[in-house]
Regions:
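Class I SAM-dependent methyltransferase SAM/SAH-binding core
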Residues: 57-105
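Conserved class I S-adenosyl-L-methionine
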Residues: 1-54, 57, 61, 149-179
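Acceptor-substrate binding/catalytic loop of class I
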Residues: 127, 187-202
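A C-terminal cap/extension of S-adenosyl-L-methionine-dependent methyltransferases
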Residues: 216-272
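A short acidic, Gly/Pro-enriched loop at the edge of an enzyme's catalytic core
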Residues: 107-116
Length: 272
C-alpha cells in the first residue's frame, strides 16, 4: 500500500520534482552539496547507478561530467520526464538506460555491475517497512563493485519535527505527530508520500550493519536548514555574503550538529 501511495504521489508531482532542487538558493544547497561530495569521492570515470533517480537531475549532471549513468525509479511519470530532459541536455549517449522498478529489487542488474551507486533525494526513506529498507541497502551494495562509493541521502526526523512546529502547528495535536516523533514512520495522508524520517545515527548504523564503511555524514542544508526565506534573501541581495556562507556551509556541514538539524542528510560510504 505504501509503495502505491509513493508511486501515486510522484506521478502527480511531475515537473515540480524536476524543478525542486534548483527552485532557489535554499533548495540548491541540497543539490550543490550532494554534487560537491560526489566530485570528492567518485572515481574519475565509470558506470553509475542512479537508484531512485526520479526525473534525472543528478543523472544528467553526472552525464555532463563524463560518467555513464543508469536511471532506475519507481514512478513511470518521473522516468518520462527524465527521458525528455536527458534528450534536451544531449546526454543520451551517457544516460543510455532508464528503467522502472523499486530499489529493494535491483534484480535486473548483475552483482558488482557499477563503479558507484547513488540513492539521493530520499528514495530509501520512502520505504516505510524496515525489512524492505534493509533489502534496498543490500541491493545498493550488491550491484556496486568492491571499493566503490555508495551515496545515500534521506530526510531528517528532527528537521521534520521543527517544520511541524514552524509551518504546520495544527498537526502537532494529530496522531501522526507522535508517530513520527517516536518511530520516524509516516504512512501518508497529510500532503506528502509515505516516508521513514531518519535520525543520523540510525542511518549510519543501518548502513554499517549491512556492511558499508561510512566515510562521512553530511548535512545537505546544514546550518541553514529551516531558514529558506533568510537563505534566499542572502543569496539574492548579498552575493558576497552568500559566497562566504557557502564556504561556511562546506566547512560545517559534516559536523554532527549540522547533520542532526539538516532537512536532508547524506551518508558517503564505501563498499569494502
Amino acid at each position: 500500500m505504501s509503495e502505491a501511495l509513493v508511486k501515486k504521489y510522484y506521478c502527480e508531482q511531475g515537473s515540480r520534482e524536476w524543478r525542486r532542487l534548483v527552485t532557489d538558493a535554499y533548495r540548491r544547497l541540497e543539490f550543490d552539496t550532494s554534487k560537491y561530495f560526489m566530485r570528492k569521492y567518485l572515481p574519475k570515470k565509470g558506470l553509475i547507478l542512479d537508484a531512485g533517480g526520479g526525473p534525472g537531475r543528478y543523472a544528467i549532471e553526472l552525464g555532463k561530467m563524463g560518467y555513464d549513468v543508469v536511471i532506475f525509479d519507481l514512478s513511470p511519470e518521473m522516468l518520462k520526464i527524465a527521458k525528455k530532459h536527458v534528450r534536451s541536455a544531449c546526454v543520451q549517449k551517457r544516460v543510455s538506460r532508464i528503467i522502472q522498478g523499486s530499489i529493494d529489487d535491483l534484480g535486473v542488474f548483475e552483482d558488482e555491475a557499477f563503479d558507484a551507486t547513488i540513492c539521493l533525494g530520499a528514495p530509501l526513506a520512502h520505504i516505510v517497512d524496515e525489512a524492505r529498507r534493509e533489502k534496498a541497502i543490500d541491493e545498493l551494495i550488491r550491484v556496486a563493485k568492491k571499493g566503490s562509493p555508495v551515496f545515500v541521502s534521506v530526510i531528517g526526523r528532527p528537521a521534520v519535527l521543527v517544520t511541524e512546529l514552524i509551518r504546520l502547528p495544527w498537526e502537532i495535536e494529530l496522531g501522526v505527530f507522535p508517530k513520527i516523533r517516536d518511530t520516524g514512520d509516516y504512512y501518508g495522508g497529510y500532503g506528502f508520500a509515505p516516508c521513514h524520517f531518519y535520525e543520523p545515527e540510525e542511518l549510519k548504523k543501518s548502513l554499517e550493519n549491512r556492511g558499508l564503511e561510512v566515510l562521512e555524514m553530511v548535512g545537505l542544508e546544514g546550518l541553514a536548514s529551516g531558514h529558506q526565506k533568510e537563505t534566499n534573501r542572502l543569496a539574492r541581495k548579498q552575493p558576497k555574503a552568500w559566497k562566504i556562507w557557502w564556504e561556511t556551509h562546506l566547512k560545517t556541514c559534516t559536523q554532527e550538529t549540522s547533520v542532526g538539524i539538516s532537512e536532508h542528510f547524506m551518508a558517503v560510504c564505501r563498499k569494502p
